[in-house]
Amino acid sequence: YMEDAAQKTRAQDELPQSAGGRTITTTEPKFIPQEAVELKLAGEVTIRVRLVDCVGFMVEGAAGHLEDGAERLVKTPWYDHEIPFTQAAELGTRKVITDHSTIGVVVTTDGSFSDLPQETYLDAENQAISELKKLHKPFLVLVNSSHPSSRTAREAAERIEKQHSVAAM
């Protein structure tokens, strides 16, 4: 928990927007909160935490990266010219993994909260896990679910644990 009420309010205000559906709402990596916050865990353990939200690897069927049937071009801080959205998303995600993280959190799904089936997330899930393993970054996998205690959610976590030999919950 956070003891400083003002810091907690500021951190909450800096959370990214989210919405249902297929449209990508993240456009670039965002540090949340902007400055690391102190959290008290069980006992006397205190940690400083800051998350990084990024698009991640593209999922088949997602919307927002195309405009009039063509890949959207976006400006990034890494190039002096526009590049395709998918390329920017992958580049930003890789930079977050390699340059800005000490512990990774891969967020995937059992397919329960959107109209995209679980299978459409598998390539992106595999790619993220492979990147983290290749760099020997510690990480865990979270299965986002509308029904976290359901058999489907448990089976998704078990599949990931078995397939990748990693912790998933």
Q: What would you call each of these model-derived segments?
A:
Residues 1-78:
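Conserved G1/Walker A P-loop phosphate-binding module
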Residues 42-45, 95-99, 161-162:
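Solvent-exposed alpha-helices and their adjacent loops that cap or buttress functional pockets
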Residues 46-50, 102-103, 138:
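Loop/turn-to-beta-strand initiation segments
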Residues 56-58, 110-113, 146-149:
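Conserved nucleotide-binding/hydrolysis micro-motifs of P-loop NTPases
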Residues 60-64, 115-119, 150-154:
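Conserved ATPase-coupling elements of RecA-like P-loop NTPase cores
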Residues 62-114, 131-132:
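Inter-motif core of Ras-like GTPase G domains
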Residues 120-126:
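Charged helix-capping and loop-helix junction motifs
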Residues 127-140, 145-169:
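Canonical P-loop GTPase G-domain recognition
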